[in-house]
A protein has these predicted regions:
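Structural preference for solvent-exposed beta-strand-turn elements
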Residues: 1-174
């Protein structure tokens, strides 16, 4: 696999996907990010409960896929690279390199086959909502989301779709 893209694009994708990657997992691949290069590049983070992927434009010289280091470390590495074109390459021997300007990092990658597949989203259950409306819903209910980790069921919001109406409920347990 080999591709090149603007640093800010890859950095944004890595930052987004890193939010879903597992910090500690018995499946070591879940601590990293799955990078897939084809017509563009997809960066995926997944912890078996939540998954985030982001597609970016890139010049793909050699299609392929691999799992690159821990998400946290990869995110930090992206932050330290100078602005410009980043080239990511993973050879058949699983040696990976990331180059940008005068900076170059080398490390070992894991095979993409080690990364569990994200469940497919059922498009029949999809909802389209404007960013402004969703932001308003979140702003009006976020205060009620619990931060108490001993009761994780209250650490999120419930979205219900009934008769074309989307309702969002947040509760902190009180």
């Amino acid at each position: 696999m080999k591709f090149s893209c603007e640093k800010h694009l890859l950095q944004a994708a890595v930052a987004a996907a890193s939010r879903a990657a597992s910090a500690k997992s018995p499946i070591s691949a879940l601590e990293g990010l799955l990078i897939e290069a084809g017509s563009g590049v997809r960066v995926t983070g997944y912890d078996l409960k939540k998954g985030i992927y982001m597609n970016i434009e890139a010049d793909v010289a050699q299609p392929g896929s691999a799992v690159l280091m821990t998400a946290k470390l990869f995110s930090e590495m992206m932050r330290l690279l100078p602005d410009g074109i980043v080239t990511v390459e993973v050879g058949d021997d699983s040696r990976a390199s990331v180059r940008c300007g005068q900076s170059e990092y080398g490390f070992m990658a894991l095979p993409a086959a080690d990364y569990p597949e994200l469940p497919e989203v059922d498009e029949s259950e999809a909802v389209r909502i404007s960013q402004k409306a969703l932001r308003s819903m979140i702003d009006e209910s976020i205060f009620a989301v619990s931060t108490n980790e001993s009761r994780p069921v209250y650490m999120g919001s419930l979205f219900e779709l009934e008769g074309g109406r989307l309702t969002m409920v947040s509760v902190d347990g009180y």
